[in-house]
């Protein structure tokens, strides 16, 4: 992982999977749980926040084969790799702090990206996600969290300059404030998948 003059960090798409699986042994279980949490929603349009190399999108599209996916990531290099896996997807350079792509979506998904925002940033993002979801749509958030038991912290993180995980309870509260009916669908140590349905 390298930082650029703007203070952003970028992963090497060639080595990202090896890095994340070495630091996060439950990575593939998290990915499977993320895809599972998207089931049960009639889905034609998907928005992914933090596409990375396309690992999550590929799994979600396997569940929703006829859906169209729009995705953002701040790394053009990661998106180049993702486009090879997802040639039909509309992938764009963009940050979580920026305006989300226009339109109404049935499903919004984010895996291992939102923990880079602080608490206020997460709460504000959840409000903007709710605005993009149709009634009956779902937001699936899979991420690094602060566990109740500190001994469950297994994923290496920095001093808060880039990694800013939050407690599950706080994220459920922010999601509820944004209008979601939110619940935890999977959890393992310092990882969790949360599904929020928009009434």
Kindly label every feature range from the protein language model.
Residues 138-191:
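C-terminal alpha-helical "lid/dimerization" subdomain adjacent to the S-adenosyl-L-methionine
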Residues 112-116:
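Short catalytic micro-motifs in class I SAM-dependent methyltransferases
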Residues 109:
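A conserved beta-strand element that flanks and buttresses the S-adenosyl-L-methionine
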